[in-house]
């Protein structure tokens, strides 16, 4: 009988030990989870200097190219070097403005040309060229607004389950339908990426196109994910040395899809919350 009582007492003690150990482990796990959450909430990034390549990408459809515009780079006198309906080759001079040569980026046909000795303003369409081939059209209004006039643009494309990645032969401004009231005008905010005639594609194929401009060096950059806002201006949460959280307005420049250029509002070394103000449940 005494032996039975001892066995029961021993079992009770062992059960109590296991129960306390389990509670301790659960408590430790909960504490670690709280610590991880606190650490995650306190994540920050610093404003750094670096390089960034302005980039825009989208998925679109291959279509026959439409005529594109060649514009005057400045105010001045335009003199033509070609005739209407003339067949031209890539790199051929089509005219000059104040002595500056205007060249066609591709082979094509001149379908419209301004008269010689004509005074033209900057950005005035002086010629329309028809390229016989395929193209990809990209809505790039926001992208273009961050770039200087006549920025050098390059593009590559990848056909879905097909050819690529392949260089585009030119990035141009497509012409809108001309009429007696509007004259020659570009399609606003649209870039037309021309595909070489030697590349085997067909109309209607889906493709991803990536357009890039000249890389900018030694600029202030932050990850896109920390900013509320994407175009022109945005908001970030600056963490001061004493831990104060300050909602700060910033002026934004070009982006490569992952990072964005900071034009004003922050300085190199500033510490910013990794959570943008509009997504931070704690507020400011």
Regions found by a protein language model. Give the residues of each.
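Small beta-strand-rich domains/subdomains or short beta-sheet motifs embedded
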Residues: 53-63, 68-75, 100-107, 137-139, ...
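N-terminal beta-strand block that forms a small beta-sandwich/beta-barrel module immediately after a flexible targeting
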Residues: 30, 34-77, 92, 274
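Beta-strand/loop subdomains of soluble extracytoplasmic proteins
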Residues: 40-41, 45, 107-111, 134, ...
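Gly/Ser-enriched beta-turn/beta-hairpin loop segments
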Residues: 28-36, 63, 175-189, 241-242, ...
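C-terminal motif of bacterial Sec signal peptides marking the signal peptidase cleavage site
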Residues: 19-22
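Short histidine-centered loop motifs in beta-beta connectors
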Residues: 73-93, 111-125, 194, 259-265
């Amino acid at each position: 009988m005494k032996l039975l009582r001892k066995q029961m007492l021993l079992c009770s003690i062992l059960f109590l030990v296991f129960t306390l150990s389990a509670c301790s482990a659960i408590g430790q796990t909960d504490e670690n989870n709280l610590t991880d959450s606190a650490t995650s909430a306190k994540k920050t990034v610093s404003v750094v200097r670096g390089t960034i390549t302005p980039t825009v990408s989208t998925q679109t459809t291959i279509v026959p190219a439409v005529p594109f515009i060649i514009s005057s780079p400045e105010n001045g006198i335009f003199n033509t070097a070609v005739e209407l309906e003339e067949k031209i080759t890539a790199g051929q001079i089509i005219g000059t403005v104040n002595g500056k040569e205007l060249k066609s980026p591709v082979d094509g046909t001149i379908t419209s040309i301004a008269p010689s000795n004509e005074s033209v303003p900057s950005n005035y369409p002086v010629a329309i060229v028809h390229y016989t081939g395929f193209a990809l059209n990209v809505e790039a209004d926001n992208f273009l607004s961050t770039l200087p006039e006549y920025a050098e643009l390059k593009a590559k494309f990848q056909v879905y389950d097909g050819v690529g990645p392949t260089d585009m032969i030119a990035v141009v401004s497509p012409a809108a339908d001309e009429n007696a009231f509007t004259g020659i005008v570009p399609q606003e905010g649209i870039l037309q990426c021309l595909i070489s005639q030697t590349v085997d594609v067909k109309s209607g194929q889906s493709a991803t196109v990536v357009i890039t401009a000249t890389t900018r060096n030694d600029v202030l950059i932050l990850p896109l994910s920390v900013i509320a806002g994407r175009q022109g201006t945005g908001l970030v949460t600056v963490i001061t040395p004493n831990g104060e959280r300050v909602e700060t307005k910033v002026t934004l420049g070009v982006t490569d899809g992952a990072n964005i250029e900071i034009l004003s509002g922050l300085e190199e070394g500033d510490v910013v919350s990794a959570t943008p103000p509009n997504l931070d449940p704690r507020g400011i």
